[in-house]
Amino acid sequence: SKAELIIAMAQLQHSEGLIICNGYKDAEFIDLGLYARQMGIPCFFVVETLSEVLIIIERSRALNIEPLIGVRIKTTVAVDGYWSQDSGDRSIFGLSTANLMELVDRLREAGLLHCLRLLHCHLGSQIPNIRNVRNGVLEACRFYSGLVQEGAPMCYLDLGGGLAVDYEGARTNSTHSMNYGLDEYCANIIESIRETLDP
């Protein structure tokens, strides 16, 4: 919300933190984020629909302030667990591969591809199987690498969701459990990123 963005701007005025703007973004919200950028606050707009990028481009031109842009991608990895029906290609959030390429084309045409610096994906919710987490991170890294090859100077990989709670205490990959601990979760994410992005 605009109120939350104003609070974040006040807190980060003399900090090295980032503001990541997900969710609904209208022209006023984008203007506010662009003013934050003008103040030296790194405020990213995470594009979740193609219509958002048109508003970002238009407001950026009107205010003559370059945006910081991120993109939320929809991975194809279907995950196990309670939310499996809404995972992978069936997810309603994020851009598909075709939409991602259209975003890149629109930013390139607008001369703003250099503003695309962050890739975000939400791996899922309450993922019981560590293999699903690893596969999701590997796919996100391939998207990240593809954006670099397209000419975007990527800097940030923002991985959300996934970490489960072992409600059963069974340490299995059943719907209400998890077959990994926090250390293994973190290690798998780091190893997957190194495996894909570290030359």
Task: Identify the role of each PLM range.
Residues 139, 161-199:
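Active-site anion/phosphate-binding pocket segments in diverse small-molecule metabolic enzymes
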Residues 2-156, 165, 181:
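Active-site-proximal beta-alpha core segment in soluble small-molecule metabolic enzymes
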